[in-house]
Amino acid sequence: MATVEPETTPTTNPPPAEEEKTESNQEVANPEHYIKHPLQNRWALWFFKNDKSKTWQANLRLISKFDTVEDFWALYNHIQLSSNLMPGCDYSLFKDGIEPMWEDEKNKRGGRWLITLNKQQRRSDLDRFWLETLLCLIGESFDDYSDDVCGAVVNVRAKGDKIAIWTTECENRDAVTHIGRVYKERLGLPPKIVIGYQSHADTATKSGSTTKNRFVV
């Protein structure tokens, strides 16, 4: 004769387990909304407006400092694009503690990789090149030589705009040339385009309109 299996009484354990699972998932997911991604360095963004009635230093203004990826994008998306600035204005991004001037202790023995743009490039290349420059800096894109980087400057000028990465020691050939090669590659410049590195001392004492290049890539 067939036997009837005894009915099993349902356990009350599964629902709490489901609740725990849900709570656990929430605990894992939620912190992503609050955790910011730290940068290796703290950076300061400066703005320069050429008001001839004021001293050079009075025209230089600190906009903000940041040390996370999210705070960088919040700042970048809030300010005017370089291509919309009035001629005579600059943006500078430097490591916190370094001022965007040749006389700063970290800059005075250094120099810059200089990108010179023609008037037509303000519309086509300026903003793209400047953003890529910023990302190179905050992303520490120059490998072991990123410590040699002090900052970068974009000069908006009627005759043609300029972008430059500043390094701390112009005599450090290995660091300077590596930074130049990586920078040129990141900007997507073709091999036939040559960019030059000039020391700040040479730029400050130049007799003509151009400064001699210490290095080229």
UniProtKB/Swiss-Prot annotation:
UniProt-reported outcome of changing residue 209 to A: Abolishes phosphorylation and abrogates the ability to transform cells
Residue segments, region EIF4EBP1/2/3 binding: 37-40, 73-77, 132-139
Effect the entry attributes to changing residue 56 to A: Abolishes mRNA nuclear export. Impairs nuclear pore complex reprogramming. No effect on interaction with PML or viral Z protein but reduces binding to the mRNA cap. Capable of AKT1 activation. Does not impair interaction with HHEX or HOXA9
One Gene Ontology cellular component annotation held by this UniProt entry: postsynapse
Residues that bear Phosphothreonine: 22
UniProt subcellular location: Cytoplasm, P-body; Cytoplasm; Cytoplasm, Stress granule; Nucleus
Ranges of Low complexity composition bias in the record: 1-11
Biological process, per Gene Ontology: behavioral fear response; cellular response to dexamethasone stimulus; G1/S transition of mitotic cell cycle; mRNA export from nucleus; negative regulation of neuron differentiation; negative regulation of translation; neuron differentiation; nuclear export
Residues found modified as Phosphoserine: 209
Effect of residue 73 to A: Binding to CYFIP1 reduced by 70%. Does not affect mRNA nuclear export or nuclear pore complex reprogramming. Does not affect affinity for mRNA cap. Reduces interaction with LRPPRC. Reduces affinity for PML and viral Z protein
Post-translational modifications: Phosphorylation increases the ability of the protein to bind to mRNA caps and to form the eIF4F complex. Phosphorylation also enhances its mRNA transport function. Phosphorylation at Ser-209 is not essential for protein synthesis.
Keyword Mitochondrion found: no
Highest taxon of source: Eukaryota
UniProt entry keywords in alphabetical sequence: Acetylation, Cytoplasm, Initiation factor, mRNA transport, Nucleus, Phosphoprotein, Protein biosynthesis, RNA-binding, Translation regulation, Transport
Positions where N-acetylalanine occurs in the chain: 2
Region ranges (Disordered): 1-27
Binding positions (mRNA): 56-57, 102-103, 157-162, 205-207
Family annotation (Gene3D superfamilies): RNA Cap, Translation Initiation Factor Eif4e (3.30.760.10)
Resulting phenotype, residue 69 to A: Reduces interaction with LRPPRC. Abolishes interaction with LRPPRC and abolishes CCND1 mRNA export
GO molecular function: DNA-binding transcription factor binding; enzyme binding; eukaryotic initiation factor 4G binding; mRNA cap binding; RNA 7-methylguanosine cap binding; translation initiation factor activity
Quaternary structure annotation from Swiss-Prot or TrEMBL: eIF4F is a multi-subunit complex, the composition of which varies with external and internal environmental conditions. It is composed of at least EIF4A, EIF4E and EIF4G1/EIF4G3. EIF4E is also known to interact with other partners. Interacts with EIF4ENIF1/4E-T; promotes recruitment to P-bodies and import into the nucleus.
Chain's role: Acts in the cytoplasm to initiate and regulate protein synthesis and is required in the nucleus for export of a subset of mRNAs from the nucleus to the cytoplasm which promotes processes such as RNA capping, processing and splicing. Component of the protein complex eIF4F, which is involved in the recognition of the mRNA cap, ATP-dependent unwinding of 5'-terminal secondary structure and recruitment of mRNA to the ribosome.
Protein name in UniProt: Eukaryotic translation initiation factor 4E
